[in-house]
């Protein structure tokens, strides 16, 4: 991001807005947003003092209809212009999630907050047994994950449990996220968050600041009670 801001396009004059995306896949709720390179790029622009918008397209199936994508892009262009022209006070970046649904331009655009959720069913990675003379097919694995994301399926079945401990140092892993955790957290949430809005077919706009906001109510000096002990103790 900084290379683009400071080392390219200088002949065009100062950059007044950075658009990161569109990412083909939603960046809603905490678990997706915190690992999003799309939002990360917009945050990097924001900490450089440039207004920025992270744009993501939320798909629901693998039917990538060109007309639906075109409709989402047309809406995105209008929405970006609207946000740019009336930039909110205190906002450093916006996270925009546009659902890939028919007639999205006729559906609601909602202000939202980020749904606080978590991975609750265990690891999003699985150990895979790969013979020494073979390697995993990353392209095929990515395609399978995308199919699971579209269908809302988990990476592994309930009750399957984790892998047994293997007595060797080298392990290979594949990403097998438990999308059910995300979809259930959205279904159980109250209206008003980004995941809920997209699930309703509405476009979500979340105003953000480029920081990890502290929790209010903690102030002053921290005093440790009890006797001083060594940093390390033998058990």
Give the location of each predicted region.
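Glycine/threonine-rich flexible loop motifs
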Residues: 27-36
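Acidic, metal/ion-coordinating pockets
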Residues: 2-11, 43-44
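C-terminal accessory domains and tails appended to enzymatic cores
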Residues: 66, 83-235
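Glycine- and Gly-Pro-enriched alpha-helical subdomains that act as flexible
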Residues: 72-79
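Glycine-rich phosphate/pyrophosphate-binding loops
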Residues: 42-71
């Amino acid at each position: 991001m900084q290379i683009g801001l400071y080392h390219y396009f200088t002949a065009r004059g100062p950059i007044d807005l950075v658009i990161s995306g569109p990412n083909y896949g939603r960046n809603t709720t905490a678990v997706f947003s915190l690992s999003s390179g799309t939002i990360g790029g917009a945050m990097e622009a924001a900490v450089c003092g440039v207004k920025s918008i992270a744009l993501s397209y939320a798909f629901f199936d693998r039917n990538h209809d060109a007309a639906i994508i075109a409709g989402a892009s047309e809406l995105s262009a209008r929405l970006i212009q609207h946000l740019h022209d009336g930039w909110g006070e205190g906002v450093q970046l916006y996270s925009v999630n546009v659902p890939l649904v028919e007639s999205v331009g006729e559906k609601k655009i909602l202000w939202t907050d980020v749904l606080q959720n978590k991975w609750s069913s265990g690891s999003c990675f699985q150990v895979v047994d790969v013979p020494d003379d073979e390697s995993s097919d990353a392209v095929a694995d990515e395609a399978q994950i995308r199919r699971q994301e579209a269908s809302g399926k988990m990476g592994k079945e309930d009750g399957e449990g984790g892998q047994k401990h293997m007595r060797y140092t080298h392990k290979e892993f594949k990403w097998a996220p438990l999308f059910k955790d995300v979809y259930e957290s959205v279904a159980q949430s109250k209206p008003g968050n980004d995941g809920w809005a997209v699930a309703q077919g509405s476009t979500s706009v979340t105003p953000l600041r480029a920081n990890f906001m502290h929790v209010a109510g903690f102030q002053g000096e921290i005093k440790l009670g009890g006797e001083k002990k060594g940093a390390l103790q033998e058990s």
